[in-house]
Every structure is written in structure tokens, then in C-alpha cells.
A protein has these predicted regions:
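Amphipathic, hydrophobic N-terminal targeting peptides for secretion and organelle import
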Residues: 1-42, 193
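Surface-exposed, charged secondary-structure patches
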Residues: 109-155
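Short beta-strand edge/turn micro-motifs at domain boundaries
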Residues: 28-39, 159-192
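Core segments of small alpha/beta cavity-forming domains
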Residues: 40-120
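A mature extracytoplasmic/lumenal domain signature
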Residues: 103-105, 140, 149-153, 166, ...
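Extracytosolic low-complexity repeat regions of secreted or lipid-anchored proteins
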Residues: 46, 144-156, 161-169
Length: 193
């Protein structure tokens, strides 16, 4: 009688463990499926930059380029555009953010995106220089990094490539923020991946 009770209890425990494993595994599969259906805009706008800020100047520019690619090549709602501009402004240094208030920045992005659309220009690909090509300097006690990026554009049946240099400054928390950026000429030092 005791042996039968122990066998039944053991079978019940094994069934409970198997059932728990199935439930946990099924929930994680569902969570993974939900993640897979997020658009690039949603992946960027749901990224918590307060907890997961990019660690290097290169990663900051890569994230900014993902945002730029969304601006000029994807469909988004006005609320998503607000969220995209919020994320971009979090990457900006205080000086750049002060010179680009959210409403002004959003209007500029909207006008540029419309201009690209009117001219049938698409941003086909972006690239950022290798980690070894990032230049670091110290200026008036501030750590500064220079990161080159490339933009492969398609207009009708023709293609062009432009280059920009991003200047980033490390803030008091150690985060790299975009201080400014400008168009540069292509040369052998500008090759990006």
C-alpha cells in the first residue's frame, strides 16, 4: 500500500514538473513570436535608452542611422514619429539638443522625409566606420570622438554615396552623445562597412 502511494506521488510530481516546463516553454515561445512581429520603428521606439544606452561612439551612430533610415524609408504614425524623435534627441549632446528643440527637429525631419519622397530618393544602406577608425581626442577636458558614416542613396535608377562625420562628446555619466555632424568628402580614410 505504501509503495503504491509513493509511486502515485512520484508520477504526480513528474507530471507537475513536465506540465510546468511546458507552460514556461510555451510562454517564452509566445514572447519570442511577439518580438518577431515588431517593426524596426517599434524596435527602436521601445528601446529603453535610460537602461540600455549604446556603449561606444560607433554604437551611438549606428543607432542614430537606424533612426534616420526609419525617417526616410518606413511608414510610421505621428505618435511613432514623436517616439523616434524622442529617441534621436536622447542621443544628442545637450548643446545639439538645445539648438534643435523637439518641435523644430520634428518639423525638419518631416520636411526632409517629404522631400526625399517627392524626389523618389530612398536610403538604401547606411554604414559606420570600423572601431579602429574612430578618432579620439581630448578638448578642454572633454573626451571627443569622431565617427565617419556613409549613406548609399537611390534616386530613380541612379545611386550615390554620401559621407558624414559625427562628433560625439562623452557626458558626465560616461555616455557618448552626438555633438554635431556634417557632410564630408569621400577619401581613402572614409571607407565604411
Amino acid at each position: 500500500m505504501k509503495k503504491t502511494g509513493i509511486v502515485i506521488l512520484t508520477i504526480a510530481l513528474i507530471a507537475a514538473i513536465c506540465g510546468s516546463f511546458y507552460v514556461v516553454n510555451d510562454k517564452s515561445k509566445r514572447a519570442n513570436q511577439k518580438e518577431k512581429v515588431l517593426t524596426e520603428v517599434q524596435r527602436i521606439t521601445t528601446k529603453d535608452l535610460d537602461k540600455n544606452y549604446p556603449q561606444t561612439p560607433r554604437e551611438v551612430v549606428k543607432l542614430y542611422n537606424r533612426i534616420v533610415k526609419c525617417y526616410y524609408g518606413m511608414q510610421y504614425s505621428d505618435e511613432e514619429l514623436d517616439a523616434l524623435t524622442d529617441q534621436a534627441l536622447k542621443l544628442f549632446d545637450d548643446e545639439l539638443a538645445a539648438n534643435n528643440p523637439k518641435d523644430t527637429y520634428k518639423q525638419s525631419v518631416t520636411a526632409d522625409a517629404q522631400s526625399y519622397k517627392d524626389k523618389a530618393v530612398t536610403l538604401a544602406q547606411t554604414g559606420v566606420c570600423d572601431s579602429n577608425d574612430v578618432k579620439y581626442v581630448t578638448d578642454n577636458g572633454s573626451k571627443i570622438a569622431y565617427v565617419n558614416a556613409s549613406y548609399f542613396m537611390k534616386e530613380g535608377s541612379s545611386y550615390s554615396k554620401t559621407y558624414q562625420e559625427y562628433v560625439l562628446r562623452q557626458d558626465k555619466e560616461g555616455c557618448w552623445r552626438i555633438l554635431t555632424f556634417y557632410k564630408i568628402a569621400a577619401d581613402s580614410d572614409t571607407e565604411t562597412e
